[in-house]
Design a protein with these regions (language model features):
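Juxtamembrane intracellular "pre-TM" segments in multi-pass secondary transporters
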Residues: 19-24, 206-248, 272
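Helix-breaking motifs and short loop linkers at transmembrane-helix boundaries and internal kinks
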Residues: 45, 61, 93, 114-120, ...
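Extracytoplasmic gate region of multi-pass secondary transporters
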Residues: 49-50, 239-297, 387-391
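Conserved MFS/SLC helix-loop-helix module at the cytosolic interface between two early adjacent transmembrane helices
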Residues: 80-119
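Helix-to-loop junctions at the C-terminal end of transmembrane segments
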Residues: 83-93, 296-308
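Paired small-residue
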Residues: 108, 119-127, 336-344
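Cytoplasmic helix-loop-helix junction between adjacent transmembrane helices
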Residues: 122-165
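Helix-loop-helix hairpin linking two adjacent transmembrane segments in secondary transporters
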Residues: 158-212
Length: 442
């Protein structure tokens, strides 16, 4: 029997060209790419509220808190779905789970584009969260079955980098498309494209090399199909660990704050404190998304290369806290400083995302779905809580003015809102320090 030696890089064959469908080393990259495109769409949808904020507030006649709740409807259902997602990914497999999710969230996107009332928009965005909730964990479950353990942190980083790419698409490109075609036709078109890719996932993805009729890859522990009782047993083991809860709190704070910055309040903050247009302000969140594009794979590669995890989390956390501290303490920082903070915030979140590799390494491959889903649920619960919390803080300092139907807030109001975010990141850093103490590198 031929056993393929895996490599994190796409192999180059000198003697002959092997089909993408029959070479397991190439097949895994083909399928990962398709899953990554679907995950890109999830992130585009979930971060789209920032550049559409004025249009949504005017179109649905809502306040800052109302907009925060509309934005957060995605994340509440996304967070609640994480444990069921882990069970589905381990029990039904990533192929079926990802295909079903892609269909559901793109139907939600089409519904959001057609919504005429706040309540329909709320339900449609929640539907996007329902379907989108399964894509990330399904992709990580696929990686656990097709890549070696010493490649997982890198693959986790590359997958999260796709979130950054989706975030980039949700900034200036989305703003330009909304200006050119209108936000409703743009969202509708993206939903149609997403449905097409749902079909591609079903056609190409397989849960493991063996289920694709291919030879196994050397040193890859393929998770077997589990009974429901086995999955629940794994879940109980994951929930029994203190490390699980510490990582969950850390991701609740760190991820929740960044998604709130890039996905909602980051653009209005720049517009109202720097006096620029929405399109110009979207360049700042684009920088944050670019940081998210390069940070996680860089941290992941360093973690795999030098066998370090928790030390990187602490180092990244210190930089993260410093950046938000400036936004909290300085009423209107220089534009260059704001741009740098947005970029470094996205990049240093990559350090915190190493916790997915930490939790996965503590459990068998067969439990990778429930282990990563558990902590991922906390991350997106934070993304649901912080938009509304910061929105209430901003509404307290509303000037009483509106511009194009959107509320105008004071600089001090933004400082209070960012103070909430900074406090949360300090908590995340403390969690990282605890992990470094309990699980020292090496």
């Amino acid at each position: 029997m031929t056993v393929w030696r895996g490599s994190i890089f796409i192999p180059v064959r000198v003697c002959h060209v092997v089909s993408l469908r029959t070479d397991p080393l190439r097949r895994r990259w083909l399928v990962w790419t398709v899953l990554a495109i679907v995950f890109l769409l999830v992130n585009l949808y979930r971060l789209s509220s920032a550049v559409l904020a004025d249009r949504l507030m005017a179109g649905f006649n809502t306040t800052g808190a109302g907009l925060g709740t509309l934005h957060a409807s995605f994340f509440y259902i996304y967070a609640l779905m994480q444990l069921p997602t882990g069970i589905l990914a381990d029990r039904a497999g990533p192929r079926k789970t990802a295909t079903a999710g892609a269909i559901v969230f793109n139907v939600g996107a089409i519904g959001f584009a057609l919504a005429q009332t706040y309540h329909v928009a709320f339900l449609s965005r929640a539907l996007i969260g329902l379907g989108g909730a399964v894509i990330f964990i399904s992709t990580l479950r696929f990686c656990a079955n097709w890549f070696r353990a010493d490649e997982f942190a890198t693959m986790n980083g590359l997958t999260i980098a796709i979130a950054g790419l989706g975030g980039i698409m949700a900034t200036t490109p989305l703003a330009l498309a909304a200006n050119a075609f209108g936000w409703r036709p743009t969202m509708f078109g993206l939903g149609v494209v997403g449905l097409l890719f749902a079909g591609v996932v079903w056609l190409l993805a397989r849960d493991s090399p063996e289920s694709a009729g291919l030879e196994p890859i050397e040193d890859v522990e393929t998770g077997t199909t589990l009974t429901l009782e086995e999955v629940l047993q794994n879940l109980r083991a994951v929930l029994a660990e203190r490390e699980t809860w510490v990582i969950s709190l850390m991701l609740f704070c760190s991820t929740g704050v960044l998604i709130t910055l890039l996905g909602l309040w980051g653009v209005p903050y720049v517009v109202q404190t720097q006096g620029v247009s929405v399109t110009t302000a979207s360049y700042y969140t684009l920088l944050g998304s670019f940081g998210l594009l390069v940070g996680p794979p860089t941290f992941g590669w360093v973690a795999d290369r030098f066998e370090t995890r928790t030390g990187l989390i602490v180092g990244g956390g210190i930089v993260y806290v410093a950046g938000f501290g400036v936004l909290t303490l300085v009423p209107s920082p220089h534009q260059g400083i704001v741009a740098l903070i947005y970029f470094t915030s996205g990049a240093t979140l990559g350090a915190f995302t190493l916790s997915y590799a930490v939790i996965k390494d503590r459990h068998a491959t067969a439990a990778s779905g429930v282990s990563t889903a558990t902590v991922n649920g906390a991350a997106f619960l934070g993304a649901a809580v912080f938009p509304t919390a910061m929105g209430y803080a901003l509404d307290t300092y509303w000037t009483g003015e509106t511009v194009a139907g959107s509320r105008v807030y004071t600089e001090f109001g933004y400082q209070v809102a960012f103070g909430i975010a900074t406090a949360a990141i300090v908590v995340a850093l403390c969690c990282g320090l605890w992990l470094h103490w309990k699980l020292p590198d090496g």
